[in-house]
Amino acid sequence: MAQFQIECVESNTEESRNHYSKFILEPLERGQGTTVGNALRRVLLSNLEGTAVTAVRIAGVSHEFATVPGVREDVLEIIMRMKEVILKSYSSQAQIGRLLVNGPTTITASHFDLPSEVEVIDPTQYVATIAEGGKLEMEFRIERGKGYRTVERGREEATSLDFLQIDSIFMPVRKVNYSVEEVRADGSIPKDRLLLEVWTNGSISPQEALSSAAGILVDLFNPLKDISLEPTDTNSDIPDDPTAQIPIEELQLSVRAYNCLKRAQVNSVADLLDYTQEDLLEIKNFGQKSAEEVVEALQRRLGITLPQERSSKHN
């Protein structure tokens, strides 16, 4: 089967928070263009990991409807600005960023004091304006994740009650479009051409996003390559009957009956269950009285009844 080719035919990275690329994948079999395009679009939008500010703590503020003296924006507006800040974290652990600014000044993302594992994508991104004599002191939690996390879920996972939770958007891919064209070369069988457009927030390039999405799909389908259709042993997960493992000493038999069973290599109740009442009489020196004793002991102590019929495996 011939492999398709992928080509980036257009790319625009002029804006730090808006990267765009257009890809062409061809040739694909009829119908595969929609299949591949839809799968890639879904993974690009929902399964790629990104970074977001998930909570903030502002000095002197206890709720999001408060104001900070000397700051033009109220707390709710500051939270909304922090929600829009584009960051990239190289750590799987939550990180803490800090901000301490005195007015008068215009605060941007360049004022952030960030851990070495975190970088800001656009240092010019606006946060707030402070007047003369004003001061803004803030800590904010930075996390990696997928998709969208609500405030309610953030509160459930929060480790500090004085942080104000934020609806967090982790998705590094902002938008995906795809279309399928029919192509035919020299009168051959028509094929599909997939045109895929990807917009990202700058924390990842469209090429990196597409590669990651393809890797996720490969990992998802890879186990299907080695499907085993052999029947499984339905009894393998059934635990052994603990009663069957009881030694025959627990039956408190007479010495004669006990010794006869031991010489016949009957050491547990499980061994006894291989016998019928008639089979017991075939054991050397094991008479009718001993057989009745064993049958009665099994019934009385364990509620087990040996069948009467002669077994074909003990002759």
UniProtKB/Swiss-Prot annotation:
Q: Which CDD domains match?
A: RNAP_alpha_NTD
Among the GO molecular function terms of this UniProt record, one is: DNA-directed RNA polymerase activity
Q: Where is this region: Alpha C-terminal domain (alpha-CTD)?
A: 243-315
Report which superkingdom the organism of origin falls in: Bacteria
Q: Which reaction does it catalyse?
A: RNA(n) + a ribonucleoside 5'-triphosphate = RNA(n+1) + diphosphate
User: Which UniProt keyword terms apply here?
Assistant: DNA-directed RNA polymerase, Nucleotidyltransferase, Transcription, Transferase
Does the keyword Transcription feature in the UniProt annotation?
Answer: yes
On whether Transcription is a keyword of this UniProt record, the answer is yes
Task: Tell me a GO biological process for this protein.
Answer: DNA-templated transcription
Coiled-coil region: none
SMART domains tied to this protein: RPOLD (SM00662)
Naming one, the record's GO cellular component terms include: cytoplasm
One matching Pfam family is: RNA_pol_A_bac
Residue ranges, annotated region (Alpha N-terminal domain (alpha-NTD)): 1-228
Q: What does this protein do?
A: DNA-dependent RNA polymerase catalyzes the transcription of DNA into RNA using the four ribonucleoside triphosphates as substrates.
SUBUNIT field: Homodimer. In cyanobacteria the RNAP catalytic core is composed of 2 alpha, 1 beta, 1 beta', 1 gamma and 1 omega subunit. When a sigma factor is associated with the core the holoenzyme is formed, which can initiate transcription.
Indicate the family of this protein. Belongs to the RNA polymerase alpha chain family.
Q: What is this protein called?
A: DNA-directed RNA polymerase subunit alpha
Q: Which gene encodes it?
A: rpoA
